[in-house]
């Protein structure tokens, strides 16, 4: 074979001219270069794809880590709201503005609604700004007052402290009036009527309230609250019927089905109660203090109380007992030796009058005894909710 017949890509036909041979060899050389380039590009693409896979893994890892931190932040919030918010801000999971914190609470995913309520009710300047931003996330336009309250009271659980409730309901009333101009003469009117509706809900759907308020009584109770004038009777009747037909749905965080009867208790917890029968035995009961009554249950999940002690006309005192520590008593200071007006449920379901001259109760610790005595004294002496309403009604009356 001719020496020119060798080279890249095999032999060259002998019948080609020198010029054609050179052109063919040039084509073969460029083909090889292209094949080499393609192989190099394949290698580079493979490297890039590997880098992309690594980056994706890193991003997924970051997302997983972020989700874990958010979940941790929610848990911290449910245990201590201020520390939970601080943790989320420090880890760049939440901006430090009141608006961002309000949005986080409003979404509420994985958050305890009782804790949300306590946090929003705090009087720190930042918390007040968060409350304002939180309320502004609610759209109440074209809703009647009951519809707006349903939406508002589902987004958190009202705290038990009167001052906290006052701030939150004041913010609600201002927002409702802003969204619905002309419905009420003032935010005070909206505030007073909102409380009247909440109390109506409790009265209508509390199994222990025998004398259920009628629409006429509800209308009469709210006369003169609109800057001295009356609200339209049709409006009040519609609000009454709405609550009568469907009670408020209150968020339940503890699994107990007590929300209709025991709306925002002043205090609740386990205590020991000395029996009133011939054989005096101590029994552990779950106590709930609300609406100037002390209710006790056998279990936290019971729907009906085992006993009800109205606190009207009673007093409370600390006592020593040789068998149990941290004791206090409820007694009637005006009629010593007289059986206290109360009722209890027997094992067969019958409701009978109590037979206690005094109710002796033992708390788990000295601190809890002091807290219970303080709460019961406050409940006996005055109801802060009625104080707040009385203040608003006086303010309305003074505007006449």
UniProtKB/Swiss-Prot annotation:
Domain PH span(s) in chain numbering: 264-381
GO aspect biological process, one term: establishment of epithelial cell polarity
Subcellular location: Cytoplasm, Cytosol; Cell membrane; Cell junction, Adherens junction; Cell junction, Tight junction
Membrane topology annotation: Peripheral membrane protein
SEC7 domain span: 77-206
Main location: cytoplasm
Record text about domains: Binds via its PH domain to the inositol head group of phosphatidylinositol 3,4,5-trisphosphate.
Protein name: Cytohesin-3
Organism: Homo sapiens
């Amino acid at each position: 074979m001719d020496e020119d017949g060798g080279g890249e890509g095999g032999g060259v036909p002998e019948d080609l001219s020198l010029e054609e041979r050179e052109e063919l060899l040039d084509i073969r050389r460029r083909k090889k270069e292209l094949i080499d380039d393609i192989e190099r590009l394949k290698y580079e693409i493979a490297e890039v794809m590997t880098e992309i896979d690594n980056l994706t893994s890193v991003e997924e890892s970051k997302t997983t880590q972020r989700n874990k931190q958010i979940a941790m932040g929610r848990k911290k919030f449910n245990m201590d709201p201020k520390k939970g918010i601080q943790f989320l801000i420090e880890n760049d999971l939440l901006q430090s503005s009141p608006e961002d914190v309000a949005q986080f609470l409003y979404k509420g995913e994985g958050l305890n609604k009782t804790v949300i309520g306590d946090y929003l009710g705090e009087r720190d300047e930042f918390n007040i700004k968060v409350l304002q931003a939180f309320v502004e996330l609610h759209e109440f336009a074209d809703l009647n007052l009951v519809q707006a309250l349903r939406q508002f009271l589902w987004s958190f659980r009202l705290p038990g402290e009167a001052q906290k409730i006052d701030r939150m309901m004041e913010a609600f009333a201002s927002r409702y009036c802003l969204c619905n101009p002309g419905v009420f003469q003032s935010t005070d009117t909206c505030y007073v009527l909102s409380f009247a509706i909440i109390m109506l809900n409790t009265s209508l759907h509390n199994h222990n309230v025998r004398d259920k308020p009628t629409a006429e009584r509800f209308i009469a109770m709210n006369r003169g609250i609109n800057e001295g004038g009356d609200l339209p009777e049709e409006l009040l009747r519609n609000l009454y019927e709405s609550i009568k037909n469907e009670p408020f749905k209150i968020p339940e965080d503890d699994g107990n089905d007590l929300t209709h009867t025991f709306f925002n208790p002043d205090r609740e917890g386990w205590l020991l109660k000395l029996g009133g029968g011939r054989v005096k035995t101590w029994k552990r009961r779950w106590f709930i203090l609300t609406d100037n009554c002390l209710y006790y249950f056998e279990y936290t999940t019971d729907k009906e109380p085992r006993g009800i002690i109205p606190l009207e006309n009673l007093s409370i005192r600390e006592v020593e007992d040789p068998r149990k520590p941290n004791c206090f008593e409820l007694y009637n200071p005006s009629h010593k030796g007289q059986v206290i007006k109360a009722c209890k449920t027997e094992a067969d379901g019958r409701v009978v009058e109590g037979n206690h001259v005094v109710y002796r109760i033992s708390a788990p610790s000295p601190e809890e005894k002091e807290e219970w005595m303080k709460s019961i004294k406050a409940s006996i002496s005055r109801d802060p909710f009625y104080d707040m309403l009385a203040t608003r009604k006086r303010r309305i009356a003074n505007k006449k």
